[in-house]
Amino acid sequence: VVLPAYFTDNMVLQQNTKVTFHGKAALGKTLKVTTGWNNEVYVAPVNKDGYWTLSVPTPAAGGPYTLTFTDGKKLQLKNVMVGEVWFCSGQSNMEMPVAGWGKVMNYEQEIAEANYPSIRLFQVKKNTSVTPLSDVEATMGGWQECSSATIPEFSSLAYFYARSLWKELNVPVGVIDCTWGLSLIHI
């Protein structure tokens, strides 16, 4: 089973909705997903090119959970949370990292105190393409728990927004940092 880079350990899935998983699996097999929040098994056929798609209902906020994907060989995603997920995109004003550019007030203290395991971070690696891409690369190897080690190069605006949401809602929060100063969203 092969999943896109944004389906990893430590991820956050949006609560109270349907999440669409997709990926590649062995030809001639059936893909099964077992969700840790209800131990239900969901099944999807693998098409002639090896691709599959499957929508799975998510519960109210909670976790951590394990998701198990199998086509005969098992892949597990661990420490998965369910809560709020936000996509943060923009140019330099959104890109400015917590430790960067000397403009975040008290950034050393903010980094030292950034211990929020219920806030999860996904940072998209910068890339250009003239055609749509089916996947992205993650700068930190996938979803990470918010900590002093993971926050310095992350978007300060995305981080402070996630922290504010987490304090207000008291649910896991996932933020996706897809920023690039002086860039266009399309050509």
Regions found by a protein language model. Give the residues of each.
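Residues in well-ordered beta-strands of folded domains
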Residues: 4, 68, 81, 120-122, ...
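Extended acidic/polar, glycine-enriched regions
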Residues: 28-97
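Active-site phosphate/pyrophosphate- and oxyanion-stabilizing loops and adjacent acidic/basic residues
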Residues: 163
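Conserved small/polar residues in nucleotide/adenosyl-binding loops
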Residues: 185-187
